[in-house]
Amino acid sequence: MFRGHSNRSLDPKGRLMLPPEFREEIFRLVPDGRVMLTNNFDGAISGYPMPEWEAVEASFRAGNTLMPGFRDIERFFIAGATEVTVDKQGRILIPPYLRTYAGLDKEMVLAGVGTKFEIWDQGRFEERLRQTAANFNAHMEAMAASGVSLRF
């Protein structure tokens, strides 16, 4: 599992140094260090170890491609995806089109979100946390109404 968050920066070539605990989790799941990066709906980048990404793709294969909305979402995630490999120094190269999509310049946040991790522009991440805190009760009520039960 990927947990926690840390401030990071890109090197001049667009590479991101992963923290040791993230590298360990990736290599535990994927000995060759392959990760799939894709855009997400929050204006950030999601990173999936290959077994997790394969589950995402399987869920799309099971979907109804006759629905235009389904095709749009599939296109957004699958066409936006690119495979990268963690190098010997523990870095991943973030392609220019994903850096542009996520507004990444230099300062960013790497956030562990369970079975995946997210790469955020630091300002966007901080704003999203403020919005979440301001709407926390409404979010919890909406999840409870839809049958989601969380333990804290």
From Swiss-Prot:
<keyword id="KW-0805">Transcription regulation</keyword>
<dbReference type="InterPro" id="IPR035642">
    <property type="entry name" value="MraZ_N"/>
</dbReference>
<dbReference type="GO" id="GO:0003700">
    <property type="term" value="F:DNA-binding transcription factor activity"/>
</dbReference>
<feature type="domain" description="SpoVT-AbrB 1">
    <location>
        <begin position="5"/>
        <end position="52"/>
    </location>
</feature>
<feature type="domain" description="SpoVT-AbrB 2">
    <location>
        <begin position="81"/>
        <end position="124"/>
    </location>
</feature>
<dbReference type="GO" id="GO:0000976">
    <property type="term" value="F:transcription cis-regulatory region binding"/>
</dbReference>
<dbReference type="InterPro" id="IPR020603">
    <property type="entry name" value="MraZ_dom"/>
</dbReference>
<dbReference type="GO" id="GO:0009295">
    <property type="term" value="C:nucleoid"/>
</dbReference>
<dbReference type="GO" id="GO:2000143">
    <property type="term" value="P:negative regulation of DNA-templated transcription initiation"/>
</dbReference>
<comment type="similarity">
    <text>Belongs to the MraZ family.</text>
</comment>
<dbReference type="InterPro" id="IPR035644">
    <property type="entry name" value="MraZ_C"/>
</dbReference>
<dbReference type="InterPro" id="IPR037914">
    <property type="entry name" value="SpoVT-AbrB_sf"/>
</dbReference>
<dbReference type="InterPro" id="IPR003444">
    <property type="entry name" value="MraZ"/>
</dbReference>
<comment type="subunit">
    <text>Forms oligomers.</text>
</comment>
<protein>
    <recommendedName>
        <fullName>Transcriptional regulator MraZ</fullName>
    </recommendedName>
</protein>
<dbReference type="GO" id="GO:0005737">
    <property type="term" value="C:cytoplasm"/>
</dbReference>
<dbReference type="Pfam" id="PF02381">
    <property type="entry name" value="MraZ"/>
</dbReference>
<keyword id="KW-0804">Transcription</keyword>
<dbReference type="InterPro" id="IPR038619">
    <property type="entry name" value="MraZ_sf"/>
</dbReference>
<keyword id="KW-0963">Cytoplasm</keyword>
<keyword id="KW-0238">DNA-binding</keyword>
<dbReference type="InterPro" id="IPR007159">
    <property type="entry name" value="SpoVT-AbrB_dom"/>
</dbReference>
<keyword id="KW-0677">Repeat</keyword>
